[in-house]
Amino acid sequence: MSRPSLTRFLIEEQHAGRIDAELRQLITIVSRACKRISIAVSKGALGGVLGDAGTGNVQGEAQKKLDVLSNDILLEANAWGGHLAACASEEMDHSQPVPDQYPSGDFLLLFDPLDGSSNIDVNVSVGTIFSVLRAPKGTEKPGDEHFLQPGTQQVAAGYCIYGPSTMLVLTLGHGTHAFTLEREEGSFLLTQANMRVPEDTAEYAINMSNQRHWEPAMQAYVGDLLAGKDGARGKDFNMRWIASMVADVHRILTRGGIFIYPWDKKDPSKPGKLRLMYEANPMSMLVEQAGGAATTGRERILDIQPTQLHQRVPVFLGSKNEVAEATRYHLDADKA
């Protein structure tokens, strides 16, 4: 029996009344853009796309050539279809409405065009993360303020991981599903429906080099993980860290674990590393739809009311019971 394609999956979701034609078109166009990015990434040095672009983004980070190329691909692909009102990117200072010469649609698209791009030159898996919101009714030219909706308002979220195979992981609010790119025919085919994150885990992903900058609750939590079966947790834990959020979260969606990027005082102007709108919200929706959980260590990420387009937050996401345990350490410390 042949595997359903992404196109068929989306049409069936539309027939079931779970999405409308505009959202189906939007996801289809994003998936096509991801195919183009996948081709560019796979060429590596042969495509002349490695290295720095010589520019910086609004985050103050040096842009890679592939950051800029991926951003341009997503902008161009989504400009003219009539399904989008505006888009916002980690690589742009402000949101960008659809050009005047094209029809405007009902949706807002946010994306990190190439998450983990610092790993490109060493051939580690990277990916595109995206989030879809509805434009507020009556909004003719959406601005930054119209994107400031809590993650619970997302109508779709996903990522495309460019690794040994290219995979699109998607939620439309009814489970999380994985599609693998069949390169010969150029189609994303459903390879894992209704992904489930195990409730318990003995695996965590964190950058331990920042340990000295963590708050006491975080120090205590990781200290107990490191103590293993001889400590308070009574079991051994393994640590994994790829330094590419897409790759780390994909592993957790596949076999469980907890991904942690906590609050730290390394840079007081950036106490949280990850962006709420482009990374934390879409990944939290995907993980929750797969039975996992996602918090800042103190509150559910999807409940946060954003105040800035490029807002940063701490992130704890993955296996539900372990996220709850990590959150408990922080809440108990706050009460002490």
Curated annotation (Swiss-Prot):
**EC id:** 3.1.3.11
Main localization of the protein? cytoplasm
- One annotated Gene Ontology cellular component of this protein: cytosol
InterPro entries, per this entry? FBPase_C_dom, FBPase_class-1, FBPase_N, FBPtase
Which residues are noted in the entry as substrate-binding? D115, G116, S117, S118, N207, K273
Q: Give the UniProt record's GO annotations in the biological process aspect.
A: fructose 1,6-bisphosphate metabolic process; fructose 6-phosphate metabolic process; fructose metabolic process; gluconeogenesis; sucrose biosynthetic process
Q: Which GO terms describe its molecular function?
A: fructose 1,6-bisphosphate 1-phosphatase activity; magnesium ion binding
Question: Residues that bind Mg(2+) 1, according to the entry?
Answer: E90, D112, L114
SUPFAM superfamilies linked: Carbohydrate phosphatase
Q: Which Gene3D superfamilies does UniProt cross-reference here?
A: 3.40.190.80, Fructose-1,6-Bisphosphatase, subunit A, domain 1 (3.30.540.10)
Q: Which cofactor does it need?
A: Mg(2+)
Its catalytic activity?
beta-D-fructose 1,6-bisphosphate + H2O = beta-D-fructose 6-phosphate + phosphate
Pathway listed:
Carbohydrate biosynthesis; gluconeogenesis
Q: What detail does the entry give on cofactor binding? A: Binds 2 magnesium ions per subunit.
At which positions is Mg(2+) 2 bound?
Answer: D112, D115, E279
Instruction: Fill in the subunit field for this protein.
Output: Homotetramer.
What name has this protein been given in UniProt? Fructose-1,6-bisphosphatase class 1
